[in-house]
Every structure is written in structure tokens, then in C-alpha cells.
């Protein structure tokens, strides 16, 4: 990431600086740069308007000056940082000494400006219920400050922790921003998770307060949150001081739909904020203060708590929203994601609001009431950019194959469509190009850890190349490495890794598990952060992301651990052992497939056990797992040391080439499994 321009940035008062030179790259060890000691290289400055090549060169040659200029230009600091960068490449600290507030940067700067105060900030849409709810920046500011007062009255203050378990409604954003205003760290849990998953996060995070809603709307279905929350609170040994439930009045229930029961001892959101004054103060937090913790699937059953700092994240968002997505103040952005995921945090809440956009908050499914739902919303609100998982577009394509429904909608306001969360397939790409009259359709690679785009097509300035993910964002250097840490050349497949140190906004630790962070990301390849994604770059510098290299599978853009599913399966009293793999699915991209070995006395009741296992996974992880495929086999392929060959099983099912390791215990097992796979596929043909 850093280059030889660093030598120009250091004044004599900065001691103990070590610059290690390598071919075309420079590494840094234990250095720091004061914001007042930067010797500006007048050759470089932030491009205006944005120019991808120019900013790439600037960030490569003068990285400290580059990020200092971004931070100074776009972020409101109550106290300017003393050092742009300090620490070392394995533990970078950005904007040390800086003091700010994320809520102030997202709301106050707009609500206090007479030009933007009455601009629409968020639009909540529930199409299946024909429900729309808009809030201006001034109104959202009021709502957030009032709820912040309610939390403050309950004793929530800087450094406290709050869990938010809510559907995609305005109140979810209000809760997040109120926490940020008070300096409390929030952890949003995806509403599709079942009670055990929620309990696990409450247990680990130990929040002072849990905030939820009584129900959410998913397509034509009402999802009840309070029964799941009650069960989670029962399962968790940690008991929060308070539980707040927003009882919705914005949606009219249909005949047969019943309000869920209340959570025992919970506080009603509306009663909590009744007749109280807005909390206009805001907590000043350090740049490194954790804005939020977001749990993501780990390679074992315990999810990883990704820590997001306030200062670096604010800087990264301001830069990427403007210069990756090409958005400017007053534009409208529609991210078809959930606030329980990083895309929701970045592209529905903090990113759009910090830049002064209008953000569409979508509650529902893209094919309900019909496959024109997204396109009608784009026409209705004159949306300028759409972000979606390919899965959602595949579902739309399935229900509107020739694009007739889409053709009835005016998409002229749309400047670009961004796809992320999983690999973009050519069929989805071509469908979107056809229905949008060849508007830019752009892949978008990033992850929970980065918090913002890594490889993409910034502001549509890179020629679109079929099947390529794109090129790195300014400020990032990527290399493709072999298992022995050798840098691979063009068109050679390996693990895609990031040259250290990482840019602002990228997590540099896991909550309560710093050693786990090192083991997961830093120890495998010295000098690099591993992404656990395989891929390659071509002769023109385009990166191609292929698949995960670990046991994380990607279901409709949701990352799930196969290990967590295995833990549920193996608890069944009739199961000896099991393996869960990710298999291709036309609609969802990838879904889990379970192979189980039954105890001998239960061989005759395989179908019964398989149905029980599907039910268990649904109850313990939730419908998000899409676990519907189970196959009983006599034995599993293993190495002589007892390791199950999951990767080979996955490739066998998906009809991919594979290499049998010399350490395999019994080759005959693979033949047996292959026969069983073919039988299964014949008896379970894909749905049309």
C-alpha cells in the first residue's frame, strides 16, 4: 500500500522510522506520522472530479498525504487527529488523537444546514403492504435525538454496548444512530437468525440494552420477533438491564395475521420516548472507538465479532460512496440489503447519510408483490444507483425472464447497478444489461472485515470486462499468493491477499479475541492480510474472484459457516458423523448440502432422520441457512489422520475437477459417494 513517497513525508522530529524496500513495493515497520509534520508533495492532490488512475497513483506514492487529505476534506473532527498513521503494519492505527462523532457526521451536518435540512434522508418501503414512510434529515435528527434521550435515561452512555434485533424499518436506523450519538457500541443481529444464534451473540457481546420490534414483513409473511427474542434471553446467561420493543403501528395486518406476544419485562419504545426532550448533545469519541461490532461467520461455530472503528470508517465511507459509487449529495441510493449485514451498515445507513444522500430502506422480497418491485421503486423515487446481491436479481429473472415487467418501468434515473456479496454470473449480468438498455452493471468485491469496497469499478471509470470482478480501490494493493507465500503472476490461481498495512476502516481486531484475528488474517502470509478467497489477476490488471478457500459458504450473499451446521447435525442421537458442503444452486448461488452417517440400527429410517435434521437447522440457525438437502451415506472420505475431505466432496457434487490427496484412507469411498450423488440428483431434480 505504501510507497517511496513516504520519505518526503517525514520531518526530522519523527524518530525510529524504518522503510524496507522491495521490488515495486515498500513496507513499513513501527512508524508514525503527525498531521502537522507532513511535507506536502504538491505534485499530488485528490482528484476533483474523481479520476481513478490519478487517485491510485496518489495513494500509492503518497499514502499518508492521500488519507490525510480525504479525512480533512470530508469528515467533521471535533479535535483534529495528531497522527494520520501510527502503529505498525500488523496493528495500524489511523487518525490517532482525533475526536469525532459518527451520528454528528451523518445527521447534524445536514440537519443544521438550511439547504439540506428538508431533504429526504430515508424512505422506508414495504411493497407487500403498500406502505411508504419518509423522513427528512431534520425529522430523522429529531427522532434519533429523542430516542437517544430515552436510552440516556436508561443509563446508556459512552462505552456501553447495545444489541439491535430488528427488521428493515426506520427504527432500526434510529436505534443505530442513537447509540452512535451516545458513544455506545451497537451490534445489529440479522432478523433471520433464530433464537440460539441471537442468544450466542447476546452471551458474547453482553449488552446493557437489547432493542427489537414485535414483527417484520418478509414478502407476504409476517415474521414475529418477540417470541424469538424471549427464547434467546432465556437461553443466554447474560441478562441485559433493559429490553426495548418497538410495537409497529405502520403496517395493517391482514385477516388471519396475529400480533406476537410481548417480551416479559420489556419496555415499549413509544412509551419510553413519550414527552421527552431531544438529546442534542453528542459524545466525543476517539477515532479508534468501536462504532459497532458485527458478527460474521467463523470457521467454527462461534461467530467472529468484527470491530469497526469510528474515524477510519467515516473516512473510508466518505471516499467510497463518492468515488466508488459515484454518488453526490442529493442523489438517491437503494441497497437491497439488511442492516444485519455489513452492506446495510455501509450502504443503507452510515455511508449514504454521511454524504447527504436519500437512502431506500427496503423491507420485503424483490419478487413480492411481483418481479417488478425493484424497478417500480427505482421509478417511484428516481433512484440513481442500485446495490443488490445477484441472488435477488436471479429471482427477478426467474419470474420475469423476458423483462416484460421491467420494460414497463422508467429506469432513466438509474446511473449504475452494483452487484456484491457473491460472484456475479454472466446470465445475471446479461439480463440486467438487457432490461436497463446497457447501463453499467458492476461487480463489487468486499467483506465484513473491510467495511467498504476493495475491488470493483470505481465510478464506472474502468472498462467493463466480462467475468472480471474489477480493479482495486485507491489505497489498496492486492497480490495473489501460493500456499508457500510466493507471489503468483498473471492468470495463476491462488489466494487473493492484501498488502499490509490495511487502509482506514478495515478492522484490525476481533471483539475479545485479538489472537483470533492474527490467526485468521495475519499469520498465514507474512506481510499480508488473507481474504480466504481464491482468484487471479489477468494481464490487464483485472482481478477475478473465484470462491472461498475455507468452509464459509455464501447463501444469497449471506456468509454461513458449514461448521456451525455440522455442530447441529452431529448432536442428533442417530448420527455418527457428518459433513456439510456448499453446492451450486441456480437461484441462491450456493446452498449447504449435508452428508450424514447413521448409526447401524437407524439405517432404515434415513428419510425420517433427514427431515428431522432439516428442521433442527431451521430452528437453530434460521431459514437463512436454506438447509434442505441431506443425504445418508455409509461412510465419508477421510485422510489417514481422520480429516474429512470436504473440498473433494464439494467438487464431486458440483462436477468440478479435483485431485485426490496421497493421504486418502480409502479410494473406494469416493466411488461410493459418487454413485450416491447421482442417485440423489435423479430423485431430486432442480425445480424449474
UniProtKB/Swiss-Prot annotation:
GO terms for cellular component: mitochondrion. Its EC number is 6.2.1.1. It catalyses: acetate + ATP + CoA = acetyl-CoA + AMP + diphosphate. Signal peptide: none annotated. GO terms for molecular function: acetate-CoA ligase activity; ATP binding; propionate-CoA ligase activity. Keywords: ATP-binding, Ligase, Mitochondrion, Nucleotide-binding, Transit peptide. SUPFAM superfamilies: Acetyl-CoA synthetase-like (SSF56801). InterPro entries: ACAS_N, AMP-bd_C, AMP-bd_C_sf, AMP-binding_CS, AMP-dep_synth/lig_dom, ANL_N_sf. Activates acetate so that it can be used for lipid synthesis or for energy generation. Belongs to the ATP-dependent AMP-binding enzyme family. This is Acyl-CoA synthetase short-chain family member B, mitochondrial. It comes from Dictyostelium discoideum. The gene is aslB.
Amino acid at each position: 500500500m505504501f510507497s517511496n513517497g513516504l520519505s518526503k513525508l517525514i520531518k526530522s522530529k519523527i524518530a525510529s522510522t524504518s522503510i524496507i524496500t522491495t521490488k515495486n513495493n515498500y513496507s513499513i515497520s513501527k512508524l508514525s506520522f503527525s498531521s502537522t509534520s507532513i511535507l506536502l508533495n504538491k505534485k499530488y492532490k485528490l482528484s476533483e472530479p474523481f479520476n481513478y488512475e490519478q487517485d491510485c497513483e496518489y495513494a500509492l506514492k503518497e499514502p499518508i498525504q492521500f488519507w490525510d487529505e480525504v479525512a480533512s476534506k470530508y469528515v467533521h473532527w471535533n479535535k483534529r487527529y495528531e497522527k494520520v498513521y501510527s502503529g505498525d503494519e500488523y496493528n495500524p492505527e489511523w487518525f490517532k488523537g482525533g475526536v469525532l462523532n459518527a451520528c454528528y457526521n451523518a445527521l447534524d451536518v445536514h440537519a443544521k444546514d438550511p439547504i439540506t435540512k428538508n431533504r429526504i434522508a430515508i424512505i422506508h418501503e414495504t411493497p407487500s403492504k403498500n406502505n411508504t414512510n419518509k423522513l427528512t434529515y431534520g425529522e430523522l435528527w429529531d427522532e434519533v435525538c429523542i430516542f437517544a434521550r430515552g436510552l440516556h435515561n436508561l443509563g446508556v452512555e459512552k462505552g456501553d454496548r447495545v444489541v439491535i434485533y430488528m427488521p428493515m424499518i426506520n427504527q432500526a436506523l434510529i436505534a443505530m444512530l442513537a447509540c452512535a450519538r451516545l458513544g455506545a457500541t451497537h451490534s445489529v443481529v440479522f432478523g433471520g437468525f433464530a433464537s440460539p444464534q441471537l442468544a450466542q451473540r447476546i452471551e458474547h457481546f453482553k449488552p446493557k440494552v437489547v432493542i427489537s420490534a414485535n414483527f417484520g414483513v418478509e414478502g407476504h409473511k409476517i415474521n414475529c420477533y418477540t417470541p424469538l427474542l424471549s427464547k434467546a434471553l432465556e437461553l443466554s446467561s447474560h441478562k441485559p438491564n433493559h429490553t426495548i420493543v418497538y410495537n409497529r403501528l405502520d403496517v395493517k395486518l391482514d385477516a388471519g395475521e396475529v400480533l406476537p406476544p410481548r417480551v416479559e419485562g420489556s419496555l415499549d419504545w413509544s412509551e419510553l420516548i413519550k414527552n421527552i426532550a431531544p438529546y442534542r448533545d453528542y459524545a466525543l469519541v476517539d477515532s479508534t472507538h468501536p462504532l459497532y461490532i458485527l458478527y460474521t461467520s467463523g470457521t467454527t461455530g462461534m461467530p467472529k465479532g468484527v470491530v469497526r472503528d469510528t474515524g477510519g470508517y467515516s473516512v473510508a465511507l466518505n471516499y467510497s460512496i463518492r468515488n466508488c459509487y459515484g454518488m453526490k449529495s442529493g442523489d438517491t441510493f437503494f441497497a437491497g440489503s439488511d442492516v444485519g449485514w455489513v452492506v446495510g451498515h455501509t450502504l443503507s445507513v452510515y455511508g449514504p447519510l454521511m454524504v447527504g444522500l436519500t437512502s431506500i430502506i427496503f423491507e420485503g422480497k424483490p419478487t413480492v408483490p411481483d418481479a417488478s418491485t425493484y424497478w417500480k421503486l427505482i421509478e417511484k423515487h428516481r433512484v440513481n444507483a442500485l446495490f443488490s446481491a445477484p441472488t435477488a436479481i436471479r429471482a427477478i429473472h426467474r419470474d420475469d425472464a423476458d423483462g416484460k415487467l421491467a420494460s414497463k418501468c422508467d429506469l432513466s434515473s438509474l446511473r449504475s447497478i452494483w452487484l456484491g456479496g457473491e460472484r456475479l454470473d454472466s446470465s445475471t449480468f446479461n439480463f440486467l444489461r438487457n432490461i436497463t438498455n446497457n447501463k453499467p452493471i458492476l461487480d463489487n468485491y468486499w467483506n465484513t472485515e473491510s467495511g467498504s469496497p476493495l475491488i470493483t469499478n470505481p465510478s464506472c471509470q474502468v472498462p467493463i470486462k466480462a467475468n472480471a470482478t474489477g480493479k482495486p480501490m485507491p489505497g489498496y494493493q492486492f497480490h495473489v499468493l501460493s500456499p508457500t507465500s510466493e507471489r503468483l503472476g498473471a492468470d495463476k490461481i491462488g489466494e487473493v491477499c492484501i498488502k499490509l498495512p490495511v487502509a482506514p476502516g478495515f478492522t484490525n481486531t476481533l471483539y475479545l479475541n485479538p489472537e483470533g484475528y492474527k490467526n485468521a488474517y495475519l499469520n498465514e502470509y507474512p506481510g499480508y492480510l488473507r481474504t480466504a478467497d481464491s482468484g487471479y489477476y489477468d494481464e490487464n490488471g483485472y482481478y477475478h474472484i473465484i470462491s472461498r478457500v475455507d468452509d464459509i459458504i455464501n447463501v444469497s450473499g449471506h456468509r454461513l459457516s458449514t461448521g456451525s451446521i455440522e455442530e447441529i447435525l452431529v448432536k442428533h442421537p442417530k448420527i455418527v458423523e457428518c459433513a456439510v458442503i456448499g453446492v451450486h444452486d441456480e437461484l441462491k448461488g450456493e446452498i449447504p448440502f449435508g452428508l450424514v452417517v447413521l448409526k447401524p440400527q437407524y439405517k432404515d429410517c434415513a428419510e425420517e432422520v433427514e427431515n428431522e435434521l432439516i428442521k433442527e437447522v431451521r430452528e437453530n440457525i434460521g431459514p437463512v441457512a436454506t438447509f434442505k438437502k441431506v443425504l445418508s451415506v455409509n461412510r465419508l472420505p477421510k485422510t489417514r489422520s481422520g480429516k474429512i475431505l470436504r473440498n473433494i466432496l464439494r467438487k464431486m457434487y458440483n462436477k468440478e475437477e479435483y485431485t485426490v490427496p496421497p493421504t486418502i484412507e480409502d479410494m473406494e469411498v469416493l466411488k461410493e459417494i459418487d454413485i450416491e450423488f447421482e442417485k440423489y440428483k435423479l430423485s431430486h431434480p432442480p425445480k424449474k
